[in-house]
């Protein structure tokens, strides 16, 4: 994950001081891209410990179309707590847009099922896309989508994916985002009988919060270790039937975790 550390250093070296919605303040750059060959290992940051349980459960929660944090709490995942209302609801966030995008005539589009069908039946299509950026429902969401738009691409029997992330918390959020979409590519590839290719991450406003500087310098002082390997223990009947216990990470030997405050 050397390129992740290089991005952190670039933000420190070239970033512009900006105000932000949370009032915390950031160093920010605009427009950055990283490419991860998923054949070379699972892109889970090793210069600090990442909570893989939260990453897996959040993705499974998205794929169920769920927008209430009850499932996350049942599995000791608290990453969405700060944005939920008193009933645990978040409004029409990722899961709703992925699985039930509303249409003007009252129907709902299951974007995930649609891209699965495209990958199986029309893999050369240039329209294998999922969007969470529903302009008509942004004001109902507890948090507007940060990872907003992703596209799949098949070549030489390998499945690749490119994500556009309009806003990126480099220290806290980005390691989760990279691992989550890499996991999704592995799951999609298994369901479509494809090998994994690349995960391409593209960032818009890519920033370090002003209260993450000490943690960032600590992480940059550490040497990256070998990437772990993802093992999927079984092939479920559908993408929506995976369980937490289906996944195992082999060889993950990270440096200790680094705590940092979340900007709300």
Swiss-Prot record:
Where do the TM regions start and end? Answer: none
Q: What PROSITE patterns does UniProt report for this protein, alphabetically?
A: THYMIDYLATE_SYNTHASE (PS00091)
The reaction(s) catalysed by this protein are: dUMP + (6R)-5,10-methylene-5,6,7,8-tetrahydrofolate = 7,8-dihydrofolate + dTMP
Q: Which residues bind dUMP?
A: 21, 126-127, 166-169, 177, 207-209
EC main group: transferase
Q: Tell me where in or outside the cell this protein is found.
A: Cytoplasm
List ligand-binding residues for (6R)-5,10-methylene-5,6,7,8-tetrahydrofolate: 51, 169, 263
Q: In which pathway does it act?
A: Pyrimidine metabolism; dTTP biosynthesis
Recorded GO cellular component terms are: cytosol
- Gene Ontology biological-process annotations: dTMP biosynthetic process; dTTP biosynthetic process; methylation
Can you tell me which family this protein belongs to?
Belongs to the thymidylate synthase family. Bacterial-type ThyA subfamily.
PANTHER family documented for this protein: THYMIDYLATE SYNTHASE, THYMIDYLATE SYNTHASE 1
What's this protein's name? Thymidylate synthase
């Amino acid at each position: 994950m050397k390129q992740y550390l290089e991005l952190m250093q670039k933000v420190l070296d070239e970033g512009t001081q900006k105000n932000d919605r949370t009032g915390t303040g950031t160093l920010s750059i605009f427009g950055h891209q990283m490419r991860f060959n998923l054949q070379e290992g699972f892109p889970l940051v090793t210069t600090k410990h990442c909570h893989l349980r939260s990453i897996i459960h959040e993705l499974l929660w998205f794929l169920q179309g769920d927008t209430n944090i009850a499932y996350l709490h049942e599995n000791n995942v608290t990453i969405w707590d700060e944005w939920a209302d008193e009933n645990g609801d978040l409004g029409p966030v990722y899961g709703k847009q992925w699985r039930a995008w509303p249409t003007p005539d009252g129907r709902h589009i299951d974007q995930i099922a649609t891209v699965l069908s495209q990958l199986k039946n029309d893999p050369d299509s240039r329209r294998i896309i999922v969007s969470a950026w529903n302009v008509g429902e942004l004001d109902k969401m507890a948090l507007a989508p940060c990872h907003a738009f992703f596209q799949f691409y098949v070549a030489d029997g390998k499945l690749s994916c490119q994500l556009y992330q309009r806003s990126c918390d480099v220290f806290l959020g980005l390691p989760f985002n990279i691992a989550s979409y890499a996991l999704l590519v592995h799951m999609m590839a298994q369901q479509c009988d494809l090998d994994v290719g690349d995960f391409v991450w593209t960032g818009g406003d890519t920033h370090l919060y002003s209260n993450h500087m000490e943690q960032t310098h600590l992480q940059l002082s550490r040497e990256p270790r070998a990437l772990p390997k993802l093992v999927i223990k079984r092939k479920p009947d559908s993408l929506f039937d995976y369980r937490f216990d289906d996944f195992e990470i082999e060889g993950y030997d990270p440096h200790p975790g680094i705590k940092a405050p979340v900007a709300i």
